[in-house]
Amino acid sequence: MITTGRVWKFWDNVSTDEITPGRYNLTKDPQELARIAFIEVRPEFAEKVRRGDVVVGGKNFGIGSSRESAALALKAAGVSGIIAKSFGRIFYRNAVNLGIPLLIGDTDELEDGDVITVNWETGEVRKNGQTLQFEPLPGFLLEIVREGGILEFIRRRGDLCIG
């Protein structure tokens, strides 16, 4: 799972309401959700994000309400994964359950607009010849992401057993 894309850098404490604001959050259609992603804080995001781009956050990315639509909107927008200093715990599981790879670590070296290559399995990020190391998902969660999310994992394997 290696991707190359542009960085969309965000700040600490990005809430699920900033990702998919409640007043727009009236649908479960992924493409509609992609169109409202970050609409109030980065209105250009939905139009300019490209498949493979990477969302980068600070501390507590995805805090707030448990709306799955926040992670679903980013997946539908084509984001290849999310790197942050830390994640809101419910957002973290929603992202994994939807098959979105996550990395944790110091994101200070990554800037908005950087083009990076990410190995989501090892946590290695390359930027302008520089290699940065992040913490990848632990084994079982990485297996879920590799399968495309929890539903696909269960469909292919028949249960949630490891091995």
From Swiss-Prot:
Disulfides per UniProt: none
Pathway the protein takes part in: Amino-acid biosynthesis; L-leucine biosynthesis; L-leucine from 3-methyl-2-oxobutanoate: step 2/4
Top EC category: lyase
A single GO molecular function term of this UniProt record: 3-isopropylmalate dehydratase activity
Function: Catalyzes the isomerization between 2-isopropylmalate and 3-isopropylmalate, via the formation of 2-isopropylmaleate.
InterPro entries for the chain: Aconitase/3IPM_dehydase_swvl (IPR015928), AconitaseA/IPMdHydase_ssu_swvl (IPR000573), IPMI_Swivel (IPR033940), LeuD (IPR050075), LeuD_type2/HacB/DmdB (IPR011827)
Alphabetically ordered keywords of this record: Amino-acid biosynthesis, Branched-chain amino acid biosynthesis, Leucine biosynthesis, Lyase
Source organism (scientific name): Pyrococcus abyssi (strain GE5 / Orsay)
Family of the protein in this entry: Belongs to the LeuD family. LeuD type 2 subfamily.
Highest taxon above the source species: Archaea
Catalysed reaction, written as an equation: (2R,3S)-3-isopropylmalate = (2S)-2-isopropylmalate
EC code: 4.2.1.33
Assembly and binders: Heterodimer of LeuC and LeuD.
A Pfam match: Aconitase_C
Name the UniProt record assigns to this protein: 3-isopropylmalate dehydratase small subunit 2
BP GO terms, sorted: L-leucine biosynthetic process
